[in-house]
Design a protein with these regions (language model features):
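Hot-dog-fold acyl-thioester-processing enzymes
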Residues: 1-52, 111-127
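Short, charge-patterned binding micro-sites
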Residues: 53-61
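HotDog/MaoC-like acyl-thioester-processing domains
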Residues: 3-8, 63-64, 75-127
């Protein structure tokens, strides 16, 4: 059985923290957006914009120094949109063990757009 490969992997830094000293949720959302775009481009090499983030759930905090993995899975491909599920796992290196913990999950809807920014069919032509 092959091990899952993250769409993106990020080491979070002091600039990413909130007033509590954990990683700001908006930073995680930004990386979820990027990871979903990477997945969508693997499915069909187009230009995409984010239409919606659904069912975002923060399970655990992300700590300074965590290595954060963003795993993606295509859920649905429509005429002009792709829905991607993103599962976020932190590798906890503060204790020196590298324990992996599920911290966040979300579903992202991306729409393929042409040069004019209007929706275009995913399966036709280039973006």
């Amino acid at each position: 059985m092959s091990e899952r490969v993250p769409a993106i992997k990020v080491l979070l830094l002091p600039k990413d923290t909130n007033a509590l000293g954990t990683i700001f949720g908006g930073v995680i959302l930004s990386h979820i957006d990027l990871a979903s775009a990477v997945e969508a481009r693997k499915v069909a090499p187009r230009r995409y914009v984010t239409k919606a983030m659904r069912e975002v759930e923060f399970h655990e905090p992300v700590f300074l120094g965590d290595v954060v993995n963003f795993f993606t899975e295509t859920v649905r491909v429509g005429r002009t949109s792709i829905t991607v599920r993103v599962s976020v796992e932190s590798e906890r290196w503060g204790s020196g063990q590298g324990e992996r913990v599920k911290v966040t999950e979300a579903e992202v809807v991306l729409v393929a757009v042409g040069d004019d920014g209007r929706p275009v069919p995913i399966k036709e032509g280039k973006g």
